[in-house]
Amino acid sequence: MDTSHATSLAVNFCGLHFNTPLVLLSGCVGFGEEYTRVEGFSNRDAGAVILKGTTREPRPGNAPHRIAETAMGMLNAIGLQNPGVQVVVNDILPQLDFSETQFCANVCGSTIDDYVEVTRRFNDSPVAAIELNISCPNIKEGGVQFGNDPDMSARVVAACRAVTSKPLITKLSPNQTDIRNSARRCIEAGSNALSLINTMTGMAINIESRKPVLGNVQGGLSGPAIKPIALLKVMQVAEVAKPHGIAIIGQGGVRTAEDALEFLIAGAHAVGVGTGLYYDPLICPKLNAGIAAYLQRHRLHSVTQLTGSLQLMQ
């Protein structure tokens, strides 16, 4: 096989240059420094890194246990533990090397005013884009209500759109009746991109104590178990987003290059990696190599040629 065929993994995402379609997902890499302690790890192996969810005021997070392993993934109920936006902007962001990759903020809140204020603070920071977490299932207020109500989702997006010129990425919840309607409303409200899916709500039980494993009772299920659901949702949302030129980050259970390729073919422009980092902190170079090999094998010059290339049965 001729391996001299030039290929590119670069992606133009909302006007931002991603050197690869891989995106490290919020909550899995701390504030961009967590995995830099691992020998061989580099943020440069990802097109973007989405920082840990940030709220207006500091949050202590949920009581333990916060994580539970499942047969094909994991449950987490961290509860958005973070030091608050003031500390993130003033103390944490200055420590990041913004030449490594595109660092994006992740904004959470219990009220629309919370979302607006945190977005406003990040607008005056060096982050490349802002992701709105309106779909977090780990807390008892805020995220679930916003993410599962298309009208409320649109109100959050519109309010944040009014206070930032940076690209807005809206993270969609799979725990709703019609994700396409939410996608449509968020696009109309001013979202530049959509990321999906967030975790699905689930629980685990300790049969000896007959108590929930998680201190919060319920948590977000991630990992390979949700990949088939995520792929379907990405395909459905892509049908809504494509006519408007809206970019998509597809995510949910990516562990192999084949997984990443499926999301691209389903309609994603970029592919999120989260739980896969726990299996293998050095997963990104392997995914990049696998995607590049696929492009070589199929004589494609750019990874962008894969986006939305799904061939449906007639």
Language-model segment annotations:
Residues 1-5, 221-246, 255-314:
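Alpha/beta catalytic cores of nucleotide-metabolism and tRNA/nucleoside-modifying enzymes
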Residues 1-103, 109:
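N-terminal capping/small domains of soluble enzymes
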